[in-house]
C-alpha cells in the first residue's frame, strides 16, 4: 500500500510538471478516494519552492487542479511544506530552540509544550546533553515534549520523533565522509 501511494505522489508531481499554466480536471473511473487524494497531493507537492532567503522570489503561474479533496490536500500539503522548510533551512539559522519554536508556532494552541534544557537536561537526559558538548552557547541541545491539549478519543496514541539540527563543527565523532552524508 505504501509503495502504491508513493507512486501516486510521483504521478501527480509528473502530471503537474507536464501541464503548463492553466486549470485542469482529471476524470477518474474505477478509482478509490485515497488514490485520488494521493495523486492530488503529489500534484500540489510539485509546486513546493524553498525561497525563504531569496530576495527576489520567482513568480510562477503553476497549473491548478480542481478536485473534491481540496481541504484535506491543503492541510497535508501545509505539513509537507513546513517539514521541507525545516529540512532546507541551514543549521546556523535553525538550531534546537528554533526547531522547538517553529513546531510550537506551527501547531498553534492545540498542544501544550514542555522544554528541558541546561542543567535539568544534563540530569534527566545525560546522553543528549553529552552529544551537545561541542555546540555553541546559542545552539545547546534540548528535549521537548508536545502534548495534545484535548483528548479526541479514548485510545492512546504515542508518536515519537526527533528533530535534529547540526553543523559539522564542535565535537567530531564521525569520519569526514560520514559528516558529508548527514543531510
Language-model-detected regions and their locations in the chain:
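Alpha-helical metal-binding/catalytic segments enriched in His/Glu/Asp
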Residues: 103, 157, 173-183
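Short amphipathic alpha-helical segment within the helicase RecA-like ATPase core
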Residues: 1-163
Amino acid at each position: 500500500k505504501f509503495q502504491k501511494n508513493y507512486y501516486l505522489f510521483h504521478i501527480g508531481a509528473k502530471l503537474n510538471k507536464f501541464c503548463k499554466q492553466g486549470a485542469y480536471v482529471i476524470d477518474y473511473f474505477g478509482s478509490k478516494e485515497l488514490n485520488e487524494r494521493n495523486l492530488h497531493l503529489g500534484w500540489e507537492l510539485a509546486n513546493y519552492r524553498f525561497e525563504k532567503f531569496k530576495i527576489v522570489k520567482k513568480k510562477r503561474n503553476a497549473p491548478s487542479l480542481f478536485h473534491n479533496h481540496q481541504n484535506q490536500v491543503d492541510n497535508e500539503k501545509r505539513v509537507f511544506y513546513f517539514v521541507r522548510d525545516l529540512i532546507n533551512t541551514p543549521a546556523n539559522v535553525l538550531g534546537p530552540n528554533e526547531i522547538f519554536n517553529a513546531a510550537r508556532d506551527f501547531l498553534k494552541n492545540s498542544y501544550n509544550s514542555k522544554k528541558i534544557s541546561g542543567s535539568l537536561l544534563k540530569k534527566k537526559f545525560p546522553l543528549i546533553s553529552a552529544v551537545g558538548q561541542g555546540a555553541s552557547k546559542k545552539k545547546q541541545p534540548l528535549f521537548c515534549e508536545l502534548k495534545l491539549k484535548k483528548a479526541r478519543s479514548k485510545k492512546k496514541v504515542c508518536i515519537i520523533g526527533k528533530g535534529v539540527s547540526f553543523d559539522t563543527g564542535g565535537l567530531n565523532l564521525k569520519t569526514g565522509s560520514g559528516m558529508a552524508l548527514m543531510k
